[in-house]
Each structure stands twice: as structure tokens, then as C-alpha cells.
């Protein structure tokens, strides 16, 4: 029977003790690193990492690993330790760096000037479309360039656009149309070819080359010089017209206010001096100086002692049949006819034809001489001032005593003009029966 050696359990026990001690040490270091930063993106392990401590090619010793156990210290601490590209790079403890900084430093290893865009079809030029257009225009050394020439220059100098999708040409056209830095020049009639030309605005050339104008912007509203001058003239004319209108309105308002004050004073004076005129014709004072516009109506006031207060109220509108004899007989006492000598008979505003038949109770009355117009021009001028009053006066003269007519006597009848009170009324009461011949 084969006897097992007694040293084997001792070697296994020593190996297990060594493995357990190393495992506890690794757990302590891991817990300490976790306590520093719990983030998943923590790079704290880079501070303790050194490629000199990583024994990639170290094999386990025969004494310590006779049963196939491996020491944890021989494993690499990071994936970079097993990367052959990292073997020649020095790894020393330092501050952690971010991934973006690593990429920036990696890209910095390849300078932009070393890339040949003319032959490299995989790298897109780091220029905006507006900058490419500006570069093509400046390279042509011409004041204007066609769209096809811009395409040709870009494809000749940048290999990327020769192999890329041709949709970039749409972007070139959009930039030419929408960017205010480029101006379209129409083709002359005698120039061969088709299509227009494009040129760059000189004030934006430097900014384009510096990369400041990389966004599309709407072109500004450009007004033709002819339209601009017409607009300026129209605005100046409008300002003058508005100023003139304001001055005219202010002057008209001032004159109208003064005229209303004068007219109102004359109206009150006329009402106070001639109470009979206020009863017979409430608008007689307006016929002497008519307003250009009917702004207000004078109140019909009466200070005549012939009528009482109740009769004055009822006399506002004389409707129905009435008798002049009853009116004169009821109010004949206490009348001072000396006031009629100062009255003036106002001729009507409209010309009165001689064929007008003025008949009262079958007796014909001739028209006064003052009623006939002095001239056609004067009649036309007076007619245009107050048409409604002229119409009332004319209609009354044509139909003096129409039966069953419900009109306001104070608006249509003028007793002074009808009876010629200046000559007909006697100065004394003894001659009053002579008035009966008119009735």
C-alpha cells in the first residue's frame, strides 16, 4: 500500500494561510479606495497604479504555488496594464484626469495643419459653408463668381466633398440666398451663359474669414433708392399736411369760438330790446348773421307784456284754427306802439318772384320793395348760408294761409314782413281802426 507523504498537508496549510493573508490585504485596500469615492466613474485607482509594480510575466514560485494557486498580486491592476501600447509609457502617481481631457490630449497629438484635406476623403473640413463660399470667391480673384465655379473650387480643394453626398450643394445655395454677406449680381444681356453671379459684401469679408459668421441670417430689407426717395418725400408731405391741418383746425376753432360769443351776445341783446320779434319770429336775429354751421339754437324767450306766462307757454306751437282779431282784441290794451318805429323789416334770404299772390281775406297785398333782390349774386350767396330757413320762408310765402296746416307760426311767419309794420301801424291808438283794412 502506497503511503502519502506527511509534508503535503503542511504545504497546503502554508499556502492557504498565505492566500488568506493576501486576500485580507486586498480587501482592505479596496475598501479604503471605495470610501474615498463611491462614484462609478472614479479614477482614484490611477493614483496608486504603477506599471513597475505589475509583474505581467511573473510566474508563480514552485514553493508557494505547487498546487496551482496563483497570487493575486501578479494580476494587473487595470486594463491599461495589459495593453502593449502602455508598456513604454511612464505611469506615475498624480491627479486624476477626465476622459474629455484625455481625448483632447490625444487629438492634440495630430495637429490640424498636418491633415491634407485635398487628398483625404475621410476628414470633413472644419469650415462653415459661408466660409467655404468666401474662400472660393477670394481664390477666384474676381469681383463676381458663378455658382458652378463655387462648386468646382470646393471639390478641387477638399476631397471630402468629392466623395460625400451631393446634398451639400443645397446648403451652399441656401447660404448664398439667406446670408446677408453675399449679394446676387444679375447677368448682363451681352454676357454669355446663364444664371446670375454672386459676390461678397466687403464689410463682411474679414468676419467670414475669422469664422465669426457661421450662422445663417435673413438678409436685411433693402429699399431701392427711387422708392426710398419717394417714401421720404411722401413722409415729408404728410408731415407738412398734418401740420397745416392742425394749424387750420386751430384757427377755425378759434374763429368759431369768437363768432359764437359775438352771436350769442347779439342774440341776447336782440331778445331784450325787441320782445315782439322773439314772439313772432324766434330766428329773426339769426337771419341777419347766419352761422356757417348750425351749432346751437337760441332759446325762444319772450318779454312782451301782451301775453301772460300761460299764454306764452301755449304759444310755443299754434296749432289748429285761430283768428287774428281775437288775438289782437285780447291783448290790445297796454301796448306801446312807439316801439314799432325802431323796428326794421328784414328782407327774405331768397328772391321772391313778383308773381307771388299775397291775399288775406280776399284782399291783395303788394310785396314790399325791400323783398326784391338787389342782385343775383347776392341772392345766391345768401341762399347758400342757411338753406333750411330759406326753404321755410319761401314755402310760407307761396302758401300763406293754407287751411288745416299744423306748422309753428314762429318758425314760418314774419308779421313784420307781412304787414309792413314800419308804415302801417299808427303811432296813436286813435288811428287803430285803420288797421282793419288789412284784416
UniProtKB/Swiss-Prot annotation:
GO terms for molecular function: DNA binding; DNA-binding transcription factor activity; DNA-binding transcription factor activity, RNA polymerase II-specific; RNA polymerase II cis-regulatory region sequence-specific DNA binding. InterPro entries: FH_FOXJ1 (IPR047512), Fork_head_dom (IPR001766), FOXJ1 (IPR047513), TF_fork_head_CS_1 (IPR018122), TF_fork_head_CS_2 (IPR030456), WH-like_DNA-bd_sf (IPR036388), WH_DNA-bd_sf (IPR036390). Disulfide bonds: none annotated. This is Forkhead box protein J1-B. Keywords: Activator, Cilium biogenesis/degradation, DNA-binding, Nucleus, Transcription, Transcription regulation. Residues 124-218 bind DNA. GO terms for biological process: ciliary basal body-plasma membrane docking; cilium assembly; regulation of DNA-templated transcription; regulation of transcription by RNA polymerase II. GO terms for cellular component: axoneme; nucleus. The keyword Transcription applies. Key transcription factor required for motile ciliogenesis. Activates genes essential for motile cilia formation and function.
